[in-house]
């Protein structure tokens, strides 16, 4: 059978962009399907746009819930593309509909998983071990560091591997106060590890510190898939990009191998099909699971690559709870711009021993504050400030007094996979294209709830030690101590987990489907566990490792 392409990739975010980059460099003829539209931050970003230049003053829109200047088109709800949640459960699903996906507006916090994160069950008896070790993926973390560029500092911390770093920027004023406070409390506080360039790197200029990374960078100084991966892949002449292509199912032939992907052309509404020798899914953890579950046939009645029944299972998200406070030492400042990147300059990696605590996995702490450009709705909680709020001249004076005096601390921690957190096909609901949608089930265990309680206490202690006043009361057990709903941190992974045992996993150690040897997954789906680190750097490294393996298999004519 003749084929149109060597490889078909579904999804253009971190994993899909990396697969396109590596495979085109290796000589493969690749087609990339993206459900959203084209996006080029050099021309489409709202960077340096002032609020007064828009009638909305930067307020949220249906396509940009984080504000109309935000670099991500999509949101928690997309017209004509619903999802459902089981009764009594709490889960929110953020979906991007644009070239590059979520890499256009993410926080660029770029952390490697540590050795213990790949052997969690061995360490504490909970969750499962990965079929790979840190040593297996370390060379690919190194490659990602060298290609993309990341700033940070070499610290030698246990289970927080150092990388190949560019120099970090200096802490801003409020971050210096956080650092000094953490030093007194015995909390580790180090420079952030962020994929924003502080020096020219691989033909891309250094960041000029406008602080608007979330809008998309016109100078391409931060990491996004279109700017760093898809652009160079297009330059090879071996990548065909199809935007507005909503994947419906992975098609299979009589031998049980994947033959391509059926999709809807969203412009015309017509069904299309692209053929390829190899199919790589990178649509996001949940979208890829949905695609497999909807790819049913007589050979695969429960969905493609699902003989284990594990597709969609063991979803996790980063745990999250936040605390904000007002710091009197930062009040009444002369108006100024806090030079720096649009992300944190310092953060607090996990510093305690879980064996001495009542919860088994850790978290890190992220920091925000400073004099960022005001936008619509800024300081909307001023009525919570000491003597703040009111009307007229007094309100204006309060805005000036308190602007830049607030500091926020955010816990981002590890969730242990459980059998009650998963997605499945909703039997009664379809999207505007007639494709069955996902129904989510979610449960936080006592592990995560106790973790959130500990974090709330810790974050409040830091703000109090800074001499600040916390703005909200301590949450209690009725709200899981402030633990946000599943999906709200937008770090959902799992659903097509990797493993050595095909009875309990979907993919092997190279993210290759046990049941279909020419099918691979390179988004967050293969993750066996979450770790207390953000997932993007591991998605990139795993995708590079898998793509190298695909290239090798092609050379050996094994797929």
Stretch-by-stretch model annotation:
Residues 191-195, 207-213, 242, 248-253, ...:
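A glycine-rich dinucleotide-binding beta-alpha-beta segment and adjacent secondary-structure elements
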Residues 77-95, 99-102, 106, 112, ...:
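FAD cofactor-binding and catalytic pocket of flavoenzymes
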Residues 25, 29-53, 236, 249-250, ...:
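Glycine-rich loop(s) and the adjacent beta-strand/alpha-helix scaffold that form part
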Residues 37-62, 96-105:
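Conserved N-terminal glycine-rich FAD pyrophosphate-binding loop of Rossmann-like flavoproteins
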Residues 59-77, 82-89, 97, 109-112, ...:
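Conserved redox-cofactor binding core of oxidoreductases
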Residues 7-32:
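N-terminal Rossmann-like FAD-binding beta1-loop-alpha1 element of flavoenzymes
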Residues 529-547:
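A conserved FAD-binding loop/helix module that cradles the flavin
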Residues 13-14, 18, 169, 286, ...:
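Residue-level detector of alpha-helix initiation sites
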């Amino acid at each position: 059978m003749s084929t149109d392409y060597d490889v078909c990739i579904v999804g253009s975010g971190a994993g899909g962009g990396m697969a396109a980059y590596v495979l085109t460099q290796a000589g493969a003829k690749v087609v990339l399907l993206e459900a959203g539209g084209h996006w080029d931050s050099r021309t489409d970003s709202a960077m340096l746009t002032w609020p007064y230049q828009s009638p909305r003053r930067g307020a949220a829109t249906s396509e940009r819930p984080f504000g109309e200047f935000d670099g991500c088109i999509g949101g928690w709800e997309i017209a004509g593309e619903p999802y459902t949640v089981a009764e009594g459960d709490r889960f929110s699903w953020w979906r991007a509909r644009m070239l590059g996906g979520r890499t256009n507006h993410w926080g660029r916090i770029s952390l490697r998983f540590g050795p213990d994160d790949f052997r969690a069950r061995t360490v504490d008896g909970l969750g499962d071990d990965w079929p790979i070790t840190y040593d297996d993926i370390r060379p690919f973390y190194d490659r990602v560091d060298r290609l993309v560029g990341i700033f940070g500092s070499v610290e030698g911390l246990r289970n927080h591997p150092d990388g190949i770093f560019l120099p970090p920027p200096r802490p801003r004023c409020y971050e210096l106060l956080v650092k000094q406070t953490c030093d007194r409390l015995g909390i580790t506080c180090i420079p952030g590890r962020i994929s924003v360039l502080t020096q020219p790197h691989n033909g891309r200029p250094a960041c000029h510190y406008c602080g608007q990374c979330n809008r998309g960078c016109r100078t391409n100084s931060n990491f996004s898939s279109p700017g760093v991966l898809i652009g160079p892949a297009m330059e090879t002449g071996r990548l065909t990009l199809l935007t507005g292509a909503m994947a419906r199912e992975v098609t299979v032939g009589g031998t049980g191998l994947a033959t391509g992907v059926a999709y809807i052309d969203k412009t015309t509404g017509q069904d299309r099909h692209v053929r390829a020798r190899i199919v790589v899914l990178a649509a996001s953890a949940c979208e890829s699971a949905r695609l497999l579950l909807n790819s049913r046939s007589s050979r695969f009645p429960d969905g493609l690559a699902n003989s284990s029944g594990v597709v969609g299972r063991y979803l996790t998200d980063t745990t999250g709870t936040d605390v904000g406070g007002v710091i009197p030492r930062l009040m009444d400042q002369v108006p100024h711009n806090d030079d720096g990147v649009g992300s944190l300059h310092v953060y607090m990696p996990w510093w305690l021993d879980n064996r001495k605590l009542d919860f088994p996995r850790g978290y890190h702490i992220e920091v925000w504050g400073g004099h960022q450009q005001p936008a619509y709705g800024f300081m909307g909680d001023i009525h919570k400030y000491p003597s703040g709020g009111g009307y007229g001249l007094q309100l204006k004076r309060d805005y000036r007094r308190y602007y830049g005096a607030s500091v926020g601390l955010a816990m981002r921690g590890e969730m242990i996979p459980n059998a009650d957190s998963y997605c499945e096909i909703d039997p009664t609901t379809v999207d505007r294209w007639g494709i069955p949608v996902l129904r989510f089930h979610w449960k936080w265990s006592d592990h995560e709830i106790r973790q959130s309680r500990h974090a709330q206490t810790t974050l409040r202690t830091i703000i109090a030690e800074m001499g600040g006043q916390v703005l909200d009361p301590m949450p209690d057990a009725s709200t899981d101590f402030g633990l946000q709903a599943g999906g709200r941190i937008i770090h959902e992974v799992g659903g097509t987990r990797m493993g050595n045992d095909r009875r309990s996993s979907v993919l092997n150690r190279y993210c290759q489907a046990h049941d279909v040897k020419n099918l691979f997954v390179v988004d967050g789906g293969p993750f066996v566990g979450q770790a207390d680190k953000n997932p993007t750097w591991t998605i990139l490294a795993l995708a590079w490792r898998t793509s190298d393996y695909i290239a090798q298999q092609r050379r050996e004519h094994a797929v």
